[in-house]
Amino acid sequence: MLSLTATTLSSSIFTQSKTHGFFNTRPVYRKPFTTITSALIPASNRQAPPKQQLYQPFRPPPSPIPPKFRSLDTAGKIEVLADRLGLWFEYAPLISSLYTEGFTPPSIEELTGISGVEQNSLIVGAQVRDSLVQSGAKPELIAAFDTNGAELLYEIRLLNTTQRVAAAEYIVDHGFDTKGAGDLARAIKDFPHRRGDVGLGDFDYNLPGDCLSFMLYRKSREHRSPSEIRTTLLEQALETAVTEKAKKAVLRELHGESEEERVKEEEIKIIRVPVVRLRFGEVAGASSVVVLPVCKAEEGEEKLLEAPMEFESGGEFGVVEAEKDWSRWVVLPGWDPVVAVRKGVAVSFSDDREVLPWNGKGEAIMVVIDREKKTVEADNGYYYLVVADGGMKLDRGLVLKEKGVNESLGMVVLVVRPPRDDDDEWQINDEDWD
């Protein structure tokens, strides 16, 4: 209940009104004036409207130009650059400032003697140095690049901040020149893209020394054994390796492979399984296509046997008709090996590294199987689909013969890799086989 507080105004009970020019005096009985205290008003269930975010005007980032150079006019900036007044990272931002004023690299070179290549190196090097400062790197590390550090920092420009700090420390500790810094940066940047390469798992990606060691280790495998170049690269890889695992991998390569490993390498050279990468839009642009039923490797033999054996296209529209219903199909271009298969089926695997001995990318693949060719031949150049624990797997003909296996689920005809934007390679090379 609300309590009301009445207050009577103490004005006169008479008031005057003017009617047709005459004053009329009549008593007026005023109603009490009521005030309601705010404490007695019940709170509303409605929430107050959210506060709107106030408009924040654009504030440009702080100028990279040191305070002592900010008041300079154009002539003053040119004078500082021409005379190299100050440290390189202090006057480097002046070059960008002149660009915004309409100067070009050739005109700046003519006025200051700084070539276009050096201008770019100074600008980028200063930006890399700023990222090291903002990352909280040790002051002594930053100071190591105060003199002639632009070229070194320019080389690590493509690395992220964490990698830049690690690379900068490695460069300082080992006294690298520009070429050494560039090799180190490329080794760190390239390491993740070498997924599946031989020996990659023996090197630590988080250590610049191991990244550089792996690059040298990988290059050594491009040369025949024995050779002076190969030995030199492996010795350098051993010197730069940090972890014990990486050192052992390099030592194994340096001291030579065992006879068993050599035999295995020779066997790999005769593999005849074609491997292709499907390109975006290739199916749509193909003059002919092949439709195949699809099974997952983990579904096992039972699912494979259920897949339709007979299917063909006909009629004016090329409608595909199968002997039984099936839920999963794949459309492939009319490649000759696939067209030649009469009773084919496609088996999907989730990780290519666990299927065939190649330098896989950890991606899904589709394996085309010829179900008419089930007899196993003692040849390492052929692969066959066989039953395995938890599904199906691929194995060499010679290995199966040694195990006493004479019949398989079918022979491998083709391995198809999925389309990728960053991979222009359409067929796997012989040297990519592990």
Swiss-Prot record:
Region (C-terminal beta sheet) residue spans: 273-419
Region forming the signal peptide: none
Domain of life where this protein originates: Eukaryota
GO cellular component terms listed in the entry, alphabetical order: chloroplast; chloroplast stroma; plastid
Main localisation: plastid
Pfam families assigned: Raf1_HTH (PF18579), Raf1_N (PF18578), RuBisCo_chap_C (PF18087)
UniProt keyword annotations, A-Z: Chaperone, Chloroplast, Plastid, Transit peptide
Functional summary from the UniProt entry: Required for assembly or stability of RuBisCO. Acts at a postchaperonin step to fold and/or assemble the large subunit (rbcL) into RuBisCO. RAF1 binds first to a rbcL dimer (rbcL(2)), leading to a rbcL(8)-RAF1(4) complex formation. In the next step, RBCS displaces RAF1, thus resulting in holoenzyme formation.
UniProt comment concerning the protein's domains: Has 3 domains, the N-terminal alpha-helical domain, an extended flexible linker and the C-terminal beta-sheet domain. The N-terminal alpha-helical domain stabilizes RbcL dimers and RbcL dimer-dimer interactions, facilitating RbcL(8) formation. The C-terminal beta-sheet domain probably dimerizes Raf1. The 2 C-terminal beta-sheet domains are swapped and pack against each other to form the dimer interface.
Gene (name only): RAF1.1
Subunit and partners: Homodimer.
Family in the record: Belongs to the RAF family.
Region (N-terminal alpha-helix): 65-254
Annotated disulfide bonds: none
Residue range covered by the transit peptide: 1-51
Protein location: Plastid, Chloroplast
One GO process term, biological-process aspect: ribulose bisphosphate carboxylase complex assembly
Name used for this protein in its record: Rubisco accumulation factor 1.1, chloroplastic
